[in-house]
Amino acid sequence: MVFRALLPYSRQIRQAIGNRRVVLKPNNVSIDIPLCATHADTLEGILEFLKSIKKLDNVVIAESAANGPTLDGFSNYGYFRLARKYPVKFIDLDKEKYEILHVFDEKDFRPHPVRFSSVLLSPDSY
């Protein structure tokens, strides 16, 4: 289903990616409750789409799980099986470099420091 949903936008997505690395950022709120995570089949649909537009040569799946070790979540949800079929790498964003940026809270209108992954902030990432 994801593959078919992306197909009408193939040209635009291919052009937008250009020569950049593709970062797939699933949402893993929990590392052991499947309903709190992006399903591996969803990621596979995206990977198949990227393959169809010849943008599968530099893809990473990157996450920072909310309640435990990210790689445990990847294992629990079957993400690692994707590496047997696609040339994808896995990144635990908690173990990568980060930048501190300040965001404003509407309750107190004060800046609060927040860690942002350098992987996600990189202009070389899409």
Question: What are these regions, as identified by a protein language model?
Answer:
Residues 1-126:
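N-terminal and secondary-structure boundary signal
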